[in-house]
Amino acid sequence: MSIEGLQAKLGLEWNAIKEARAFSQKAVMQLSSAIERERLKSSETSLIVLGSLAREECVPGSDLDWTVLIDGRVDPQHVPLAQNIRDTIQAVAAELGLQKPSPRGPFGDMVFSHDVVHAIGGEDDTNRNTTIRILLLLESVGIGKSEARQRVLTNILRRYLEEDAYFASGIPKSRAVPRFLLNDIIRYWRTIAVDFASKRRELAGEGWALRNIKLRMSRKLMFMSGVLMCFDCEMKHREQFEKCLFGPETNTLPLIELLLTDYVNCNPLDICARAFLERGKTETAREFFNAYDIFLSEMSDESVRSRLKELDYNAASDDSEFQNLRTNSHAFQKAALSFFFSDNEQLKALSQEYALF
């Protein structure tokens, strides 16, 4: 695991990251055991957990976000299946001290694969649809049978790679960055930033401080891991991309397998730790992961979470807990900027060329 390798290199131990990972793995095992009793045996359905549990950053008090992904024919039994799974998950969540998915979010129900794969962009690509698709790619774990998840992810990546305007032209590119995929990841990051402002208004400020800190930390980490996946196509896998996309016959399956194995089925912390090991400076890595460890330590404190949930917007400037977390997020941001724009010249060039315009 890359985070352990980075800890060893730096001679540090990030206890909050370690504890959250152990708790997450315990929760996934408990869920897997409970779902096995539900006899979720069809290859057309996969139970998927997302969010902090999929990132292996789950702590007591976190939301247990999940969805039943259906990749097959419509069946009236899908509704009772999802209801039974909901009851099972809620029982496990109660045992672990986890919360139900937000009723205003896209989780806690079933989703069909058709729009997730076919509606990328355009009017049919709703906020919910985009969220499910990008989180499937960046922070999802299958519980039990995962054939449906694997098929859907493969088809999503096929669309991004085979319909990329530059790759589809058959003309070799100067760089092997999958811009279609990268643009959708960037779009999602900007969407959740805008939605933060929208939710503060809609909910009259309820829970805004907790969402603010998560946006500064865990949401940003997820976004970084997606950008690194796209940039690594040029920095680490260019030769394989050229062979598969611009050879005698286009064949994206080896590329998809690579992306699934090294990125989609890894969590954001490990993806970022691996990148820091390969091309980051020691001091930048220390600042980045120290800040993230502090964030997870604070999120594991129920009194802190409760305070952030209840904090009034107008009182935030005088609240020491929120201001400390905000200052910590500035250290995290500073390290992220150094990593992308100072530590490595090739990464700096890609960030300047692809991440803004």
Locations of the language-model features?
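Short glycine- and acidic-rich boundary segments immediately preceding or forming the N-terminal edge
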Residues: 1-24
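Non-catalytic terminal/accessory segments
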Residues: 1-3, 58, 120, 349-351, ...
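Active-site nucleotide-donor binding segment shared across nucleotidyl transfer reactions
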Residues: 32-81
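Conserved nucleotidyltransferase catalytic core and NTase-mimicking acidic/glycine-rich helix/loop elements
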Residues: 151-357
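Conserved catalytic core of two-metal-ion nucleotidyltransferases
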Residues: 18, 22-40, 76-187
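Short, charged/polar micro-motifs that form catalytic or ligand-binding hotspots
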Residues: 21, 71, 75, 79, ...
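Amphipathic alpha-helical scaffolding segments
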Residues: 64-74, 81-88, 236-249
